[in-house]
């Protein structure tokens, strides 16, 4: 993207080693991005190659375990870009779209949506850091039509003190991905802006989007992460037997596609566990527990590694987090299981309060949960934090908090 800078900025940047330099081959197969943008052609659709050479190795976020290299081929990438743009077409054509990208380009979401938009002739506005005033200013300046960000970004927008000073009415399509969107955030956003936040779901291993709420439906079911996108096939199975479950029953999500990733880089054990053969077809085990209704809407329940085992019950940490985040004093929450030799795991919540809130105690939040959750789902411990550990794209790093608790207990 440094090629888009004015010539004098590129020159100074390279002289000061701020702008990266690199060598590349110069033949008929190499296209300079700056010249491609300058052509201003529209309606050009290259055929997707039947196979696909490796074009990049993208690393997972490492929210549950250490990051893993995912080899992505060109056919998968182009297919994902195509369907990502088609998913917004009921509201916007790619050519007229001005897209605010609130996720980085080293993330699969930023690549397939951001670069997919450029390949379709749209306009992409990048924000390396979540500076809300800069984002709002760009929305006004460029009359942005769409924006995507993690759920934490939408909570920050709602809490921003100067939000009423900006006109964000040009945005027709607000999208959230990367984590579960709390119901109270979606409701507050709809009440304030009169717009729906459309949820989407995908992984690095699937090359991006797997499902998305249809943008021509202003009232998607609460907590829905959408319907399966073209080019993808899904199965919801029992995590133990791998037998398909009925609609309405929660199970592990499996994903398959024509040009799918089939292995991790130099990780044979992880590859064997994640990529499996069923009925002669390769499937990726997402490790995410979802359910599906009779209309094909998918609902995120939890990650298998984040399910808390307490007194024989399997408890969704996401459900407890969502309940805590509905409290008017809470801006963020992360729930983990703490090992206990008697009950298996006890429920501990790490909570961040809003800046101007005082006088809220752990007992207040436990009482709040007791009024809204069944007794065995109520946290036993509440710990207040100034912030929660997050990845560079805003995902909660529950692994870090679990490791903290293990070290704390080993030290006692």
Where are these regions (language model features)?
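AMP-binding/adenylate-forming catalytic core of the ANL superfamily
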Residues: 140, 147, 234, 257, ...
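Adenylate-forming AMP-binding core of the ANL superfamily, especially NRPS adenylation
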Residues: 180, 213, 220-266, 274
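Conserved AMP-binding/adenylation subdomain of ANL enzymes
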Residues: 78-98, 106-146, 160
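Conserved pre-ATP/AMP-binding loop-to-beta segment of ANL
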Residues: 5, 9-14, 19-59, 66, ...
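Conserved AMP-binding
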Residues: 102-107, 179
């Amino acid at each position: 993207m440094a090629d888009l800078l004015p010539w004098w900025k590129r020159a100074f940047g390279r002289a000061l080693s701020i702008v990266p330099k690199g060598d590349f081959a110069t033949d008929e197969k190499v296209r300079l991005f700056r010249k491609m943008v300058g052509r201003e052609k529209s309606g050009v659709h290259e055929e997707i190659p039947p196979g696909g050479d490796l074009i990049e190795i993208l690393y997972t976020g490492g929210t549950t375990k250490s990051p893993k290299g995912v080899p992505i081929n060109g056919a998968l990438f182009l297919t994902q870009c195509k369907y990502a743009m088609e998913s917004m077409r009921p509201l916007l054509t790619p050519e007229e779209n001005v897209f605010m990208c609130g996720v980085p380009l080293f993330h699969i979401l930023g690549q397939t949506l951001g670069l997919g938009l450029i390949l379709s002739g749209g306009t992409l506005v990048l924000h390396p850091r979540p500076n809300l005033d800069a984002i709002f200013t760009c929305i006004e300046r460029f009359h942005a039509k769409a924006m995507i960000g993690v759920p934490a970004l939408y909570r920050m927008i709602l809490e921003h003190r100067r939000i009423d000073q900006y006109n964000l009415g040009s945005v027709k399509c607000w999208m959230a991905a990367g984590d579960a969107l709390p119901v109270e955030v979606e409701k507050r956003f709809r009440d304030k802006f009169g717009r729906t936040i459309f949820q989407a779901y995908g992984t690095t291993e699937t090359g991006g989007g797997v499902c998305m709420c249809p943008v021509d439906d202003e009232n998607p079911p609460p907590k829905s992460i959408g319907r399966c996108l073209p080019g993808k096939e899904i199965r919801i199975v029992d995590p133990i037997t791998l037998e398909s479950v009925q609609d309405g029953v929660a199970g592990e999500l499996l994903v398959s596609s024509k040009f799918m990733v089939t292995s991790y880089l130099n990780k044979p054990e992880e590859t064997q566990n994640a990529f499996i053969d069923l009925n002669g077809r390769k499937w990726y085990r997402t490790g995410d527990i979802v359910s599906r209704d009779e209309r094909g809407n998918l609902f995120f329940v939890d990650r298998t590694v984040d399910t808390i085992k307490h007194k024989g019950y399997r408890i969704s940490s996401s459900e407890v987090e969502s309940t805590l985040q509905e409290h008017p004093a809470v801006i963020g929450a992360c729930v983990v299981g703490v090992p206990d030799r008697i009950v298996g795991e006890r429920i501990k919540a790490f909570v961040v309060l809003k800046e101007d809130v005082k006088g809220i105690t752990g007992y207040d939040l436990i009482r709040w949960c007791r009024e809204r959750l069944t007794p065995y789902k109520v946290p036993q411990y509440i710990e207040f934090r100034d912030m929660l550990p997050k990845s560079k794209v805003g995902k909660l790093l529950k692994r870090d908090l679990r490791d903290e608790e293990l070290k704390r207990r080993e030290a006692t």
